[in-house]
Amino acid sequence: MPARYAVYYAPSAGDALHQAVTPLLGRDALGGLNVPQATPPGVDPVFWKAVTRVPAHYGLHATLKAPFELRHSGMDSQLLRSTGEVASRFLPFAIPSLSLAYQGKEEKGFYALVPSTKCSLLSFLERACVMDLDAFRAPLKTEDVARRGHLSLEERSNLYMWGYHRVLDSFQFHITLTDGIADA
């Protein structure tokens, strides 16, 4: 299977967000290590482990450019350089406070941390990552498209154009905390 690349936001190890959420997921994404998984107060530990299986695999992050295969092998150093160029166009900025929110459809949504107020800089950064790095992305395979299931016209257009359905105007910054579960 060819390597896949993505651009993620991940807070530094000393950041309060990293220190608070990493134990809840049981994985340190920065170090690539499993850590003892903590359970939120009042939540059954068996239930928590079950509903965090997928996010725990990846650790604390938010996607800015969804995973993709390279258009041509050997482009990884160019991709890294171009990603650095995109990042260099942005001064460091703070993400607004985060709130816990239920995302998606009732029967298959998930809980995530989302900005409590709109952050245009996040949208601009995501847009730059999606558009400026897309030349490195290999075309989608039939199974990639099929895996997405039913999409709106805009989502399907985004999928074919940019390799992912929730980008640009459909983008919402989020840090996934659970697998798909029915809204409680």
PLM regions and their residue ranges:
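Short, conserved secondary-structure transition motifs
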Residues: 101-117
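Basic, often amphipathic N-terminal segments
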Residues: 1-96, 100-105, 124-184
